[in-house]
Structure formats: structure tokens, C-alpha cells
């Protein structure tokens, strides 16, 4: 199994996409170690939350940056250790040699477009989780990639050659998890390691360079690989079609759709009750997404769940449920099912 997360990083005036792909040998044992570690951290730092899957940003906010760095190092030693290989993938381009990138070369319905290379890099960051997984697979012969299961944090992109290779050439079992770093232990682990790598880069301890990052892996005594996704890979990672991905089949099942009512998304997302929605998603091995009333009719499946927080949300959820035969749950029901 692979789990991938990524981000756009800025070091002074330099920008790059940075991804961490975990190659997990025994997912069941890894998950157990992850959950045990987080429970110990919650106890040690008196973190009051029903959840036991957190993204790195939340841990930084709860622990402080210095304590987070110490915790992340312990996480690598205890949870990652001999159970994983870490693949660090970064994308950067020489904008003087390649000033522009061509989009949609294979799209008969849409005209080709030129983008400045820096614009392309920033766009690439929105779908780099799967690009990082593709790059790790095809640059490391140690990975047995036929029919491999890949857990990806949510992304938004268009079809590339890299995507076609993952889907068609090796029949990868792709599972995209909305809010994956908050409800999926494997993606959360990737995100924690990603933040630790970023901290080392921002502190200036290591440069964003293949040889330097190999030294970083050596520092933590971790096996893995470093891949630079550079100018010679642009043709594989540039959109060749305007077809949007991920598609419905690429999402984890179930997705918990939070149905908007009278309460604004920001209030729900930052409320104590929303913690239970994330915990419920972890229990059912799914993801969490706020319902987009104008688009999600393309994606919703009878295995998904509609979660509502108020009467207005209940009415909309029930109406959608009658059309798509999707289960509805109130926030009270979700809390009762995940309280213990």
C-alpha cells in the first residue's frame, strides 16, 4: 500500500511541490501503532478530542512548533521505523529553459493552452498527491506496483499521462479521501512526515536537492528514495485533457457528505461536533466532504452517507436521499455511534 500527501512549499523566493509517499508493508500493524502513538500524545499533552487522527497543522497548533518537531521525530522512530519506506518527491523547473508549458495536447474538444511554467507549478500543487505516487513507483524498482492500493489526500486536477499510467498500465487501486489527513491514519502519517521534511528545509538544515534529502533520510535512519520530478517529466504531469479527476470511482467508500443548512460551513467545520464526523469517517474508512449542491450529483453513491446539522440540512438530505437511495444521519446519531 502507498499513502501520499503533498504541498506547495516556498523557501525565500523559490517555489516547489513537495510530496511524501509512504510505502506501508503491513497496514493493519501500522494503523495500530499509529493509533496507539496518537493516544499517548493526547494523554501527554492533555488534548481533549474524540478523534485520534490529526493532520500536522492541527498538531502544530495544539503542541507548538518545537514540541511538534520532537513529536514528529518520535513518530518516525516509533511508527514508521522498519515498517515503511519513505519516498520523497519534489517538483521544480528551470523557468529560463522552459518558459511555457502546453496544456490539452490530446483534447479534441478544447484548444491547447500555454501556461507560464510558474503558473503550471502552482497548478500542479493541486494534484501533486497522485503525481508523487506515480513518480515514486516508476523511479524505485523496489516497489511492486501491480494492482497496488494507493491512498491519496483529496486533490483536484485533470487527466495527465501519469494518471493514465496509474489507472490503465498498472491498474492501481486508487482511493481518494476528502479530508484524508484528518480521518485516514495512513494519509495523516504521510502528512506528518511531510511537515517534518518541510521543517528541516525551512530551517536550512538541508537543501531541496536529491543528495541532501538522502542525507535527511539517513538522519532518521529510514529507508526510501528521493525523486526530482523535473523538466524531463513535464510531458507526463501536464494536463493532456480537460477531463476532471478524480471521478466517482476514484473516491473512497463511503464519503460522508455534510449537507449545508442554515449554519455556515466555517461554523460547522470548527465546531466540536464536527470532530465526530471525522471520527465516524475514520471508523468506516471513508472521507468527509461538504456537499456541493451544484456538482456532487455526479459523484454521490448509495454507499455514501448524508450528514446534517440542522432542520434545513435535514430537509435537503431527505430530499436527496429519496432520489439517490443514500443513508441520512443527524449529527446526534453520528455522535452516539462514535462516542465510545
Swiss-Prot record:
This is Uncharacterized protein AF_2221. It comes from Archaeoglobus fulgidus (strain ATCC 49558 / DSM 4304 / JCM 9628 / NBRC 100126 / VC-16).
Amino acid at each position: 500500500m502507498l499513502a501520499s500527501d503533498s504541498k506547495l512549499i516556498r523557501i525565500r523566493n523559490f517555489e516547489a511541490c513537495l510530496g511524501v509517499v509512504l510505502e506501508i508493508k503491513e497496514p493493519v500493524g501500522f494503523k495500530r501503532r499509529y493509533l496507539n502513538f496518537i493516544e499517548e500524545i493526547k494523554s501527554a499533552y492533555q488534548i481533549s478530542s474524540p478523534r485520534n487522527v490529526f493532520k500536522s497543522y492541527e498538531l502544530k497548533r495544539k503542541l507548538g512548533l518545537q514540541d511538534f518537531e520532537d513529536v514528529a521525530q518520535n513518530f518516525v522512530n516509533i511508527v514508521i521505523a522498519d515498517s515503511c519506506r519513505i519516498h520523497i518527491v519534489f517538483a521544480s523547473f528551470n523557468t529560463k529553459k522552459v518558459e511555457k508549458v502546453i496544456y490539452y495536447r490530446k483534447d479534441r474538444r478544447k484548444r491547447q493552452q500555454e501556461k507560464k511554467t510558474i503558473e503550471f507549478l502552482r497548478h500542479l500543487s493541486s494534484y501533486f498527491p497522485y503525481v508523487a505516487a506515480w513518480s515514486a513507483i516508476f523511479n524505485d524498482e523496489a516497489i511492486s506496483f501491480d494492482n497496488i492500493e494507493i491512498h491519496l489526500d483529496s486533490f483536484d486536477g485533470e487527466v495527465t499521462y501519469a494518471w493514465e499510467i496509474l489507472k490503465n498500465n498498472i491498474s492501481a487501486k486508487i482511493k481518494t479521501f476528502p479530508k484524508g489527513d484528518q480521518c485516514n491514519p495512513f494519509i495523516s502519517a504521510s502528512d506528518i512526515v511531510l511537515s517534518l521534511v518541510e521543517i528541516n528545509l525551512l530551517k536550512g538544515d538541508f537543501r531541496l536537492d536529491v543528495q541532501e534529502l538522502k542525507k535527511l533520510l539517513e538522519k532518521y535512519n529510514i529507508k526510501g528514495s528521493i525523486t526530482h520530478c523535473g523538466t524531463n517529466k513535464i510531458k507526463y504531469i501536464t494536463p493532456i485533457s480537460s477531463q476532471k479527476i478524480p471521478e466517482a470511482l476514484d473516491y473512497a467508500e463511503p464519503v460522508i457528505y455534510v449537507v449545508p443548512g442554515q449554519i455556515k460551513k466555517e461554523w460547522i467545520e470548527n465546531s466540536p461536533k464536527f470532530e465526530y464526523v471525522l471520527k465516524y469517517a475514520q471508523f468506516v474508512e471513508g472521507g468527509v466532504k461538504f456537499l456541493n449542491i451544484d456538482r456532487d450529483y455526479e459523484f454521490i453513491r448509495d454507499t455514501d452517507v448524508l450528514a446534517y446539522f440542522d432542520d434545513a440540512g435535514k430537509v435537503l438530505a431527505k430530499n436527496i436521499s429519496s432520489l439517490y437511495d443514500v443513508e441520512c444521519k443527524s449529527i446526534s446519531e453520528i455522535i452516539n455511534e462514535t462516542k465510545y
